[in-house]
Amino acid sequence: MPQSSAKLVIDRPERYAKQLASHIGHKAQAISEADGITTVTFGFGGTGTIAVDSESVLLTGDAGNQEDLEKIQNILGKHLLKFAKLEDQQLDWN
């Protein structure tokens, strides 16, 4: 199962994580939160998580195949960068 993660160091990470979770939640098959980590289940297959620490937002993706993983990376990453007004940057998924 392909997995990846990306970290964005940013001021007020809680704000952007909450905004991302709220926005994505309207489009996801399911969304849940436990211990400060939001888990998003996508209808096409796979999950993403949104977590924060004191200085960053951490995104992870987990899917059944590489194509679905890339969709998750695109959805979570592009929206986070858009909300943070950092569209000219890219997240380094690994």
Segments (PLM) and residue ranges:
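Terminal, regulation- and interaction-focused segments at domain boundaries
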Residues: 1-16
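A generic structural signal for beta-strand entry/edge sites
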Residues: 3, 35-39, 54-58
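Charged, terminal alpha-helix-loop-beta segments
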Residues: 9-12, 32, 49-51, 78-81
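Non-catalytic surface loops within mature trypsin-like serine protease
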Residues: 10-12, 44, 65
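Amphipathic alpha-helical segments
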Residues: 13-25
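Ser/Thr-rich, low-complexity intrinsically disordered terminal regions
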Residues: 26-47
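Beta-strand/loop substructures that line and gate deep hydrophobic ligand-binding cavities in soluble
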Residues: 44, 48-63
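C-terminal structural segments of small proteins and small subunits
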Residues: 60-94
